[in-house]
Amino acid sequence: MIDGKEYVRTVKEYFAFLEVEYNMRLSDEVVNGSFYYDVSYKDKVRAISISYENAEDYLQVIIFILHNNKLANYDDKTKTLHLNRLNSLVLSTANKSEIDLNNEYFLGFETENGLKKRILKSAKELRLCLQHFNELSIT
């Protein structure tokens, strides 16, 4: 188990590229006891949620396409994009050089437990997905 403060700190560290490379702003931090944690980033067209349910050991990264600066209906699969689906689309288009460069970006990050490794893996996947985001056909 990870406590809320440690989760938020880890996500902010691993996903710092969202602010630096994509000019997204940290929009929300939620720590609901020891059960649910969420860190969200936002720009004018999308919001990204990195959430974790401690009891279920469930990590989830979702990109929401905004409409009039509001989140779309969660069930709208064209506007609520789960990282695992995007990752499978991107891996078929990204070349080895892009993947290697992306992995190099994250070399300095330390991970000492399973959850932090999964958070880091999600950060790597999201960064690569965002590099190809406008090329993806999401329907």
Predicted features along the sequence, with ranges:
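Intrinsically disordered, low-complexity regulatory regions enriched in serine/threonine/proline
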Residues: M1-Y14, L26-T139
